[in-house]
Structure formats: C-alpha cells, structure tokens
C-alpha cells in the first residue's frame, strides 16, 4: 500500500460485484479512513500512473533492466513481473551479495536465495545503469 499514495499511509479494498453487494454503505470502515492527506496522495499517484505513456515507460525500463541483468555472467536466472525482479545467482549467496551491495550504495533485498529488486516505477535509466555497475563490481 506504500506505493498507492507515494509513501503516505493508505489502504484500499478491491472487490468484485458479489462482494460489493455485501459491503453496503456503513458496513466497512476505519477510524482514520478517508484521511484527506492520504487521499490527496493517492489521487496524485493515480493521476500519474494513468497518464499517457507512464506504464509503457515503466515496462520499457523493466525490459532494459532485465536485459542488463542477463548480461552479467554470475546471473543464473531472472524472474518477476515488471520492475519487481528476482535474480538467481550461479555461485554466490544472495545474502552476501545483498550486504556487499548495500555497503556500496545499492539497496536491494533477498527472498530465500534470490536477490530482489523493487525500484520505483519512475526509476531512470541512469539509476538502473548505476545499480547494474554496483552489482557487477560486487559479483567480481
């Protein structure tokens, strides 16, 4: 939910028509639901994400990122959707690589034995290249 309002706490509940018939007015709510600051943040993000070409650009960046990752000899495989990317390594452990990346200015996560990349949708190509260079140096 963090990305829903650009880092401002907000949540959303999506339901199909059958469930919506059960959730009638006043049957679902929260103490701080509808906070105007959170809603303004959510609306701003929604407007940005639905603007012309935004998601196409994010998809192009994801493809570019995956292509650059696949060029690294130590990379065994790449999984994920869009810019949510998991990388399997041939020999090094994800935990060790993750720590070394952080020590060199690249913040990534792990999921079991995969490196997890979760950049923002508005990441730049230069930022992708910088991250790739750090990863390459760590994997040498």
Region roles according to the model:
Residues 1-140:
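Conserved N-terminal phosphate-binding loop of PLP-dependent enzymes in the Aspartate aminotransferase
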């Amino acid at each position: 939910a963090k990305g829903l309002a650009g880092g401002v706490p907000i949540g959303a509940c999506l339901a199909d028509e059958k469930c919506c018939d059960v959730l009638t007015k006043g049957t679902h709510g929260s103490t701080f639901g509808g906070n105007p600051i959170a809603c303004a943040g959510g609306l701003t993000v929604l407007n940005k994400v639905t603007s012309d070409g935004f998601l196409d650009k994010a998809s192009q960046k994801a493809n570019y990122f995956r292509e650059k990752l696949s060029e690294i000899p130590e990379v065994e495989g790449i999984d994920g959707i869009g810019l949510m990317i998991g990388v399997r390594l041939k020999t090094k452990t994800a935990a060790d690589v993750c720590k070394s990346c952080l020590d060199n200015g690249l913040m990534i996560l792990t999921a079991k034995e995969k490196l997890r990349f979760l950049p923002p949708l508005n990441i730049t190509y230069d930022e992708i290249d910088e991250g790739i260079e750090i990863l390459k140096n760590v994997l040498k």
